[in-house]
Amino acid sequence: MSFDPIVASGPNGALPHARPTDRPLQAGDLVVLDFGGFVDGYASDMTRTVAIGEPEPAAVEVYHIVLEAQRRALEAARAGLTTRALDAVARTYIGEQGYGAQFSHGLGHGVGLQIHEWPSVSFRTEDVLPAGAVVTIEPGIYLPGRFGVRIEDMVLLQPDGALSLATSSKALIRVAAA
């Protein structure tokens, strides 16, 4: 593993770096799954959010907002863009949907031999994204006491765009509740 995985359900999912609790999964919970490994010495990082049974309508709405924010950022990502400008693509969309204050972290980070490397893709930085770098695109919305949603993929930055290194589905998967 390239880092300790995060498996955070229900209200614990509203904590971006949640730690395990003894709270059992409940029908309607969203579960944030953040995990990664190493391949040939290089780290990986991916996050998906799944539902246990049928989530509340607000959770489905937030999921689709995060998914669209990520889609827009993936489309805009390319070498030569600044980290702040790329972060702004997702952050602006989330803000327009009324959840700006609930997107509390930067959009992503570099990944290489270590899980968190330069550049930091954030509203706090103004670095130019270099060709050949691998960065994460991971917008999230976190509603304290309720749930969180984060969707993360790694991309290879190129002068004319970004190549997604993930092929897994981003559809909201509903796992049957026990």
What are the language-model segments listed below?
Residues 1-178:
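Active-site neighborhoods and metal-handling regions in enzymes and metal-associated proteins
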